[in-house]
Design a protein with these regions (language model features):
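Active-site-flanking alpha-helical
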Residues: 80-81, 85, 136-137, 154, ...
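Active-site-adjacent loop/tail segments of enzyme domains
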Residues: 153-179
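Active-site metal-binding loops of divalent metal-dependent hydrolases
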Residues: 51-53, 74, 99-100, 130-131, ...
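Divalent metal-coordination and catalytic microenvironments
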Residues: 39, 50, 73, 109, ...
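N-terminal amphipathic/basic-hydrophobic helices that include classical n-h-c signal peptides
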Residues: 1-19
Length: 275
C-alpha cells in the first residue's frame, strides 16, 4: 500500500465513471483511500485492477464474471480480494509479476511483455522502487501504475533505491502526455501540500491544487490524472527542473549530483514532511 503517503480520509464518493474511447472506466473506493479500477468493453466484459477488497467488486459485477484481474504488486490492499473473487469465478485469469508473495497469480508477466486480453492490449512495464517486483500496465490510453506514481506524488520506497525509483518514474513520465493515470490511492490533496512546499512558484501546480480542493470538497475523486499534468506539477517527475533541484539542495544543505540524488532527497523530505 502507500502506507500513509498523503492525507488519509474516508472515501465517501460514489464510484467514478468516465469514458476512455468507447470504454467506461470506473474506480471503486475501498478501505480508507484505495481505488480499485474496472475497465469495461462495449460487450460488458470487465477488467479488474488491484482488487484489495472483493466486496465492492462483487457488488459492481453482479453475476458477470471478470474477464481478467491485473495485479501491480504484492501488498495486501491490492491483492486481498483476489481469493474471494476466484472463489466466485475460479476460471478468472490473474496477471501478476513474478513474486512468490502473489500466490494467486495464474499468469506471470515480465517487463516489455505485450498482453492481449479480450479486445484490450497492454504493455507490462517493470517499475521497481515501491516494491522490487512492482509492474505497471500501459495501454488503451491508460496507465495502471499501482503505488509507483500518484497524482502530485509517488509511493514510498519499501524495497527499492532512489535511483531505481527515479528511473521507474522517469520511464512512466516518458509515456504519451494524454495517458490517463489510474493510481491506486486518493492521496492528491496531501501530496499537493508537499508539492507546493517544493515549488511554490509553479502556476500549473497552483491551478491543479485549486481543482483538487474543489473535487475533494465535493467528495469526488481526483483521478484519473494525465501524464502531461503530472509532468507539469508533480515534483517527483521534475527532478531536472532548476526550481525543484534548488529546493532539494536547500533542504539537503549541499549540492546534489544528479536527478536520482534530487529524487532521493525529495522522497526523504516527503517521508518526514508535516504541513
Amino acid at each position: 500500500d502507500g502506507r500513509g503517503d498523503g492525507m488519509v480520509g474516508i472515501l465517501r464518493e460514489s464510484p467514478l465513471l468516465v469514458t476512455t474511447g468507447q470504454m467506461p472506466l470506473q474506480c471503486l473506493p475501498a478501505f480508507e483511500d484505495n481505488y480499485i479500477w474496472l475497465l469495461r468493453d462495449d460487450c460488458g466484459r470487465t477488467l479488474v485492477v488491484d482488487p484489495g477488497d472483493a466486496s465492492p467488486v462483487l457488488a459492481a459485477l453482479g453475476d458477470a464474471p471478470p474477464l481478467a484481474i491485473l495485479l501491480t504488486h504484492h501488498h495486501g490492499d491490492h491483492i486481498g480480494g483476489v481469493a474471494a473473487l476466484l472463489a466466485r469465478w475460479p476460471d478468472t485469469p490473474v496477471f501478476a509479476p513474478h513474486d512468490d508473495r502473489i500466490p494467486q497469480a495464474t499468469r506471470r508477466v515480465a517487463d516489455g511483455e505485450r498482453l492481449a486480453i479480450g479486445d484490450w492490449h497492454f504493455e507490462v512495464l517493470a517499475v521497481p522502487g515501491h516494491t522490487r517486483s512492482h509492474v505497471a500496465y500501459h495501454g488503451e490510453g491508460l496507465l495502471f501504475c499501482g503505488d509507483t506514481l500518484f497524482s502530485l506524488g509517488c509511493g514510498r520506497m519499501f524495497e527499492g533505491t532512489p535511483p531505481q525509483m527515479q528511473a521507474s518514474l522517469a520511464r512512466l513520465a516518458a509515456l504519451p502526455g494524454d495517458t490517463r493515470v489510474c493510481c491506486a490511492h486518493e492521496y492528491t490533496l496531501g501530496n499537493a501540500v508537499f508539492a507546493q512546499a517544493v515549488e511554490p512558484g509553479n502556476p500549473a501546480l497552483r491551478e491543479r491544487v485549486a481543482e483538487v480542493r474543489v473535487l475533494r470538497a465535493a467528495g469526488r475523486p481526483t483521478l484519473p490524472t494525465t501524464l502531461a499534468e503530472e509532468r507539469a506539477c508533480n515534483p517527483f517527475l521534475r527532478c531536472d527542473v532548476p526550481a525543484v533541484r534548488a529546493a532539494a539542495e536547500a533542504h539537503a544543505g549541499h549540492p546534489l549530483a544528479d536527478a536520482a540524488a534530487v529524487f532521493g532527497t525529495l522522497r526523504a523530505w516527503k517521508d518526514g514532511f508535516r504541513a
